[in-house]
Design a protein with these regions (language model features):
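Short linker/helix segments within small regulatory modules
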Residues: 19-28
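Residues immediately within or flanking Cys/His clusters that coordinate Zn2+
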Residues: 4-9, 27
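Short functional micro-motifs and their immediate structural scaffolds
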Residues: 17-18, 38
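Short coil-to-beta-strand transition motifs
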Residues: 100-112
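Acidic, Ser/Thr- and proline-rich intrinsically disordered linker/docking segments
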Residues: 114-267, 274, 279, 283-284
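Cys/His-rich Zn2+-binding "zinc-finger" mini-domains, especially FYVE domains
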Residues: 5, 16-17
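Short cysteine-rich clusters marking metal-coordination/redox-active sites
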Residues: 9-12, 30-33
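Anionic N-terminal interaction surfaces
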Residues: 28, 37-92, 96-100
Length: 284
């Protein structure tokens, strides 16, 4: 069979479109049959049509299971993580499966961990193209270079450039809230000159132990580097982490999220919290 010959769907026998088909270890699924799979499932290129049939049978059986699912705990924006503690089960209240009214009911033992992963804005405004982002530049419009401007030192000492929420502000918040082990801040948090990038959004990354679902991710709305919005979304993500840790018997962070440097009322400090971190001083 040639490379561009028509491929047939292993499930329904119809033609599998070149651009919309799903590859299996042996054969393909057409776009219509592909939509029957769970939106969180993955690894199909290493699976067979027998795996597809088993998965679809499980998806159909899940309808009855979900009909008896009664959540008594939830966390996150729009209650994205919902738990039925009596049955020891949970669902993700977002994504295709949720929208279609048949979210997979997972056992609590299938959830291995959850991490908060910030996404950073890789494009920082620099009107004079001197390597110093405008929010840190005391002399916009000059040709002063980032090296001469001691960019790394400024990046270390500031968390809020012109009232924005960036990587340094996030690190301060993470430390004060006791969430260090639950937040992954990658190397893309700073630009090539060492300046902290603004936080664009947050991702919740759930690691799963399930035959068909290895990882589930939820993406927040854009926080656009705004302290109030960023802190609110971070708190909501932290609530998900806290609930998961309680369910799994892990230590739960007790610190609050109030940050005096942000000029916001913040969240209520919990008893026995980590000491509050000092604010960042703006240059004169």
């Amino acid at each position: 069979m040639g490379l561009f010959d028509a491929k047939m769907c292993e499930l329904c026998g119809e033609k599998a479109g070149m651009l919309t088909k799903l590859k299996l270890s042996e054969g393909f699924l057409c776009s219509k049959c592909k939509k029957k799979l769970s939106g969180f499932s993955s690894g199909w290129s290493a699976r067979t049509i027998s795996d597809v049939n088993a998965h679809l049978q499980a998806r159909e059986a899940n309808r009855a299971i979900y009909s008896s699912f009664v959540p008594d705990m939830s966390a996150g924006p729009d209650q994205l993580f919902r738990v039925d503690s009596r049955q020891g089960a949970f669902v993700f209240a977002f994504g295709k499966d949720w929208t279609e009214g048949n979210p997979t009911v997972f056992g609590l033992n299938s959830l291995m961990s959850v991490k908060i992963v910030p996404a950073f804005d890789v494009f920082q405004e620099d009107a004079d193209d001197d390597g110093v982002p405008d929010r840190f530049d005391r002399t916009p419009g000059t040709a002063q270079t980032a090296q001469g401007f001691a960019g790394s030192a400024i990046a270390q000492s500031m968390g809020l450039g012109q009232g924005s929420f960036d990587a340094v502000a996030l690190q301060n918040l993470v430390m004060s809230s006791g969430m260090t082990g639950a937040v992954e801040i990658g190397t893309d948090s700073r630009d090539m000159h060492g300046f902290p990038r603004e936080v664009r959004s947050f991702v919740l990354k759930f690691t799963m132990n399930d035959p068909y679902v290895q990882q589930v991710t939820w993406n927040s709305m854009s926080v656009d580097g705004k302290p109030t919005v960023a802190m609110q979304v971070f708190q909501q993500c932290a609530e998900v982490v806290g609930l998961v840790q309680r369910l799994k018997g892990m230590p739960t962070p007790q610190a609050g999220y109030a940050q005096p440097a942000f000029g916001q009322p913040g969240f209520v400090q919990q008893p026995n919290a980590f000491p509050q971190q000092p604010g960042f001083t703006q240059p004169g």
